[in-house]
């Protein structure tokens, strides 16, 4: 399965697509200047278990860091992903 993950800054989200169809989304907002609040990660039920949520999160986190933003993870999935990343490093 070929999963394409795209940052869409104009919509404040990262999307995952398979064959051109959106199968997952991570939403964020710049709640205060310099901080991205990542508040929602959604993957279509039929696509769960394929690592899509992790790819969405990795892309959003990398983009935030590249832009020098702090991350405020109010979404439980993003919070768990970041905790695992810290444990691995």
Question: Which functions belong to the PLM regions below?
Answer:
Residues 1-11:
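Active-site rim helix/loop that mediates acceptor-substrate recognition in acyltransferases
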Residues 12-23:
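Conserved beta-hairpin
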Residues 16-18, 30, 40-41:
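Residue-level recognition of conserved beta-strand positions in structured domain cores
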Residues 30-38, 70-72:
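A conserved beta-turn-beta hairpin within the catalytic core of GNAT-like acetyltransferases
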Residues 41-48:
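A short, internal acetyl-CoA/4′-phosphopantetheine-binding micro-motif in the GNAT/acyltransferase core
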Residues 49-62:
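Conserved acetyl-CoA-binding loop-helix of GNAT-fold acetyltransferases
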Residues 63-76:
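Conserved GNAT acetyl-CoA-binding A-motif
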